[in-house]
């Protein structure tokens, strides 16, 4: 009997955890628009450092200082996305050009 109930309990536990995570994400504004996401990020940035300090005092060890970066990861991410999308948008014409060059090369070889 327990062997038949265990998979159901296991599945129910997984569904409950996933549903709870989805509820928390929706409630905190992570699944909304970019404005709601920005507000949620600002709340997280203001809440995380005090929590880390509290846990460091509780456990008695100290984390190293976060390194300062000279560039914005957001800009780097956006430029990478823009380059990728640009490469995908010009891919059909580029493939056509390479095909023409390849056919011309084969024609020149056969002469």
Swiss-Prot record:
Keywords: Membrane, Mitochondrion, Mitochondrion inner membrane, Transmembrane, Transmembrane helix. InterPro entries: Mic13 (IPR026769). Component of the MICOS complex, a large protein complex of the mitochondrial inner membrane that plays crucial roles in the maintenance of crista junctions, inner membrane architecture, and formation of contact sites to the outer membrane. Constituent of mature MICOS complex, it is required for the formation of cristae junction (CJ) and maintenance of cristae morphology. Required for the incorporation of MIC10 into the MICOS complex. It comes from the Eukaryota. The gene is micos13. It comes from Danio rerio. This is MICOS complex subunit MIC13. It is found in: Mitochondrion inner membrane. GO terms for cellular component: MICOS complex; mitochondrial crista junction; mitochondrial inner membrane.
């Amino acid at each position: 009997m327990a062997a038949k109930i265990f998979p159901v309990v296991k599945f129910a536990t997984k569904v409950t955890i996933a549903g709870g995570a989805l509820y928390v994400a929706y409630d905190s504004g992570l699944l909304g628009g970019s404005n709601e996401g920005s507000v949620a990020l600002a709340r997280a940035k203001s809440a995380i450092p005090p929590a880390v300090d509290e846990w460091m005092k509780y456990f008695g060890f100290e984390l190293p200082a976060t390194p300062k970066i000279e560039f914005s990861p957001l800009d780097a991410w956006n430029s990478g996305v823009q380059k990728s999308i640009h490469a995908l948008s010009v891919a059909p014409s580029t493939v056509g050009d390479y095909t023409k060059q390849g056919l011309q090369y084969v024609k020149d070889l056969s002469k």
